[in-house]
């Protein structure tokens, strides 16, 4: 102990209270513990304040788990349950998804010509037949000469008679409405003898030449008395001169 004090010196004095330094009153000492018997003057320990029924429980001090929500209720449907068996759809599933449909080769190659579903040995179109019996071809490609190209050129000239009327469209025929003819026509009432006699009399009156002549004379008289008639002014002038 003497060696320790010789090395580090004597123990320093404790720091003075804040009142001695001029910073105001210091921290009060802790209260003494209550007696074991618990007399009438002792107060009960402080408890957490109960929140009103309408207030939010998250803000109130409800213990260490006041921020956690209530756990969801237990449900029958979970991720591990088989929905097909739960809803009794096993028969429908086996009916539509259990059978294996045989698909043809033409379903995968719809753009290829010919009979695709037949084997290639029938029409000699397999790869083996091409390897064993290659087609006969020339050794090299020869360009087309000018005389051969002349057969594909278009030359100006008159059109043949067969092709002259090809651009003219034929007139469209007016199709009669068949549905109108197919409709049931109303039956025409039979003519009575009195109606036929009346029609005959009307025709005779219209064909009478004297009546036509009378109509023409009436029209002429009306035209003479009308102011638009050209001879009206001269007749009025002659009548006025005779009166003088």
Swiss-Prot record:
Q: Which residues form a coiled coil?
A: none
Summarize subunit and interaction data from the UniProt record for this chain: Component of the Mediator complex, which is composed of MED1, MED4, MED6, MED7, MED8, MED9, MED10, MED11, MED12, MED13, MED13L, MED14, MED15, MED16, MED17, MED18, MED19, MED20, MED21, MED22, MED23, MED24, MED25, MED26, MED27, MED29, MED30, MED31, CCNC, CDK8 and CDC2L6/CDK11. The MED12, MED13, CCNC and CDK8 subunits form a distinct module termed the CDK8 module. Mediator containing the CDK8 module is less active than Mediator lacking this module in supporting transcriptional activation.
Sorted UniProt keywords: Activator, Nucleus, Phosphoprotein, Transcription, Transcription regulation
What species is given as this protein's source? Homo sapiens
Q: Name one GO biological process term.
A: positive regulation of transcription initiation by RNA polymerase II
Q: Which GO terms describe its cellular component?
A: core mediator complex; mediator complex; nucleoplasm; nucleus
Q: Where is this region: Disordered?
A: 1-56, 171-244
Which segments show compositional bias classed as Low complexity?
234-244
Q: Which Pfam families match?
A: Med19 (PF10278)
Instruction: Name the chain's protein.
Output: Mediator of RNA polymerase II transcription subunit 19
UniProt GO MF annotations: transcription coregulator activity
Q: What does this protein do?
A: Component of the Mediator complex, a coactivator involved in the regulated transcription of nearly all RNA polymerase II-dependent genes. Mediator functions as a bridge to convey information from gene-specific regulatory proteins to the basal RNA polymerase II transcription machinery. Mediator is recruited to promoters by direct interactions with regulatory proteins and serves as a scaffold for the assembly of a functional preinitiation complex with RNA polymerase II and the general transcription factors.
**Family under the similarity heading:** Belongs to the Mediator complex subunit 19 family.
Its annotated compartments are: Nucleus
Gene of origin?
Answer: MED19
Residues bearing the modification Phosphoserine: 194, 226
Record's compositionally biased regions (Basic residues): 171-182, 212-224
Q: Where is the composition biased (Pro residues)?
A: 26-47
């Amino acid at each position: 102990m003497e060696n320790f004090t010789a090395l580090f010196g004597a123990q320093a004095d404790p720091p003075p209270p804040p009142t001695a330094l001029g910073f105001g009153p210091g921290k009060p000492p802790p209260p003494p513990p209550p007696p074991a018997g618990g007399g009438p003057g002792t107060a009960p320990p402080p408890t957490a304040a109960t929140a009103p029924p309408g207030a939010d429980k998250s803000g109130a001090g409800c213990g260490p788990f006041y921020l956690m929500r209530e756990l969801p209720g237990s449900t029958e449907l979970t991720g591990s349950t088989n929905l097909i068996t739960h809803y009794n759809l096993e028969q429908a599933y086996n009916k539509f998804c259990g059978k294996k449909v045989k698909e043809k080769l033409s379903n995968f190659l719809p753009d290829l010509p010919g009979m695709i579903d037949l084997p290639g040995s029938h029409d000699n179109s397999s790869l083996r037949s091409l390897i064993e019996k290659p087609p006969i071809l020339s050794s090299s490609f020869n360009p087309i000469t000018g005389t051969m190209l002349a057969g594909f050129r278009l030359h100006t000239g008159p059109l043949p008679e067969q092709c002259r009327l090809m651009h003219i469209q034929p007139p469209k025929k007016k199709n009669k409405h068949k549905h109108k003819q197919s409709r049931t026509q109303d039956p025409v009432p039979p003519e009575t003898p009195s109606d036929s006699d009346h029609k005959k009399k009307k025709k005779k009156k219209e064909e009478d030449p004297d009546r036509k002549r009378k109509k023409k004379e009436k029209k002429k008289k009306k035209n003479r008395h009308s102011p638009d008639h050209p001879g009206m002014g001269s007749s009025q002038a002659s009548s006025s001169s005779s009166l003088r």
